[in-house]
């Protein structure tokens, strides 16, 4: 099997796994009697795990283990944990299992990126074409959990534990497949010490001012972005969109197009402008949600435009961010660097976003009595998110000074960070 085909299938299953349980989880837990706070903590599992595990796994993989073997072990463990999580109906038993599962899954985002980066010739041209299969995998999970069962004459499975069982089976599949991926050996022979164990060696990258600004803005952006993941399904359903779980895959359809176009945008406009465009489209998306609704064609169309812009925003910011990190980090630290950005975005940023969003919805935007059939002031929530992102975009535009034509690579020598000027191929 050709390497690019293998990497593409790896990405497909990797993101099918996450989409299968993450999007419909709210519906199943709500039906099972979990409180809003318990559901919020359940969603926060991925963020907590992203804080604890990816940078550690990345540092160890950079030095001691072949990346594809680590991926296989984590996927097999995740399959077992998710299977047992799907059997639980009480928060006290469900939460620990979901958290343990998340600890096995979140490092694999950085691992799959690193495996792909290590086995392609042209990162900017090849990676988006491989990564787009992850988007297709996420779409496939939405269709499998949303439209497909009803098209086949079955009842809706979005509010059952079947998506979690699909996740377990898919994890086992990727665990087996990972054993046949191209060998991706460690690129460093550094010794095992406490600093490496905690992944603290990757923090040296923050000495570079541009990387620090990028890291800080990525962290801030992850907070309002989390509002979409936890609230969009409930919002779209409450304002009258039928089968919102299925329709939300439109965001991934737009992601396919713009991800394939990403090499053109990065080469034509440079990484800074593409990252900035990702921020701006996210703010516009929330603006559409502020005025969206099902009462007339125009407002209903705004809902779909908002969903479509999610794919644009994700591609232009996060996929470009992965490419930027791979260019910026030295070869022996790239997996740890990918873990660092996962820690920043899916970890601390998302965790704070989930908690901030949950608290604000309960304390500021929850109606005591339904208003026009709505239980929350959704317009207020989306307005807050749009303003946050707009402020982040301004900060990024002012302080991120990386050249559009060449990247300042960070060269780590004897534990110190030195800067090497020149374009990174």
Regions found by a protein language model. Name each.
Residues 147-169, 359-389:
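A membrane-interface helix-boundary motif in multi-pass transporters
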Residues 52-66, 149-153, 258-271, 361:
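Helix-to-loop junctions at the C-terminal end of transmembrane segments
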Residues 1-47, 210-249, 318:
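Helix-loop boundary and gating motifs at the non-cytosolic
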Residues 1, 181-216, 418-422:
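Juxtamembrane intracellular "pre-TM" segments in multi-pass secondary transporters
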Residues 85-86, 171-182, 347, 376-414, ...:
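Multi-pass alpha-helical transporter architecture, strongest
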Residues 69-83, 273-288:
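Structural signature of the two symmetry-related core transmembrane helices
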Residues 12, 81-82, 91-111, 115, ...:
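Hydrophobic core of transmembrane alpha-helices in multi-pass small-molecule transporters
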Residues 34-45, 128-133, 158-165, 237-256, ...:
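Loop-to-transmembrane helix entry
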